[in-house]
């Protein structure tokens, strides 16, 4: 039980510290990549949804 709370504490702390990265700007040399960087967090969600579509295609075996 203690391990679960420790893991939750670590996750919350890392989320709080990494939230400052959400507002960071890319260097000017990479400014043309801004649209791609904005879409990148959505990509894992698309793979998650693809798993359901794939399972529906094979009738949830």
Curated annotation (Swiss-Prot):
GO CC annotation, single: chloroplast thylakoid membrane
One GO-annotated biological process of the protein: photosynthesis
Sequence intervals crossing the membrane: 40-60
Membrane topology note: Single-pass membrane protein
Swiss-Prot/TrEMBL keywords: Chloroplast, Membrane, Photosynthesis, Photosystem II, Plastid, Reaction center, Thylakoid, Transmembrane, Transmembrane helix
Propeptide: 1-24
Protein localization: Plastid, Chloroplast thylakoid membrane
One Pfam entry name: PsbK
InterPro entries: PSII_PsbK, PSII_PsbK_sf
Summary of subunit composition and partner proteins: PSII is composed of 1 copy each of membrane proteins PsbA, PsbB, PsbC, PsbD, PsbE, PsbF, PsbH, PsbI, PsbJ, PsbK, PsbL, PsbM, PsbT, PsbX, PsbY, PsbZ, Psb30/Ycf12, at least 3 peripheral proteins of the oxygen-evolving complex and a large number of cofactors. It forms dimeric complexes.
Function of the molecule: One of the components of the core complex of photosystem II (PSII). PSII is a light-driven water:plastoquinone oxidoreductase that uses light energy to abstract electrons from H(2)O, generating O(2) and a proton gradient subsequently used for ATP formation. It consists of a core antenna complex that captures photons, and an electron transfer chain that converts photonic excitation into a charge separation.
Family label: Belongs to the PsbK family.
Protein's name in the database: Photosystem II reaction center protein K
Organism in which the protein naturally occurs: Citrus sinensis (Sweet orange)
Lineage of producing organism: Eukaryota, Viridiplantae, Streptophyta, Embryophyta, Tracheophyta
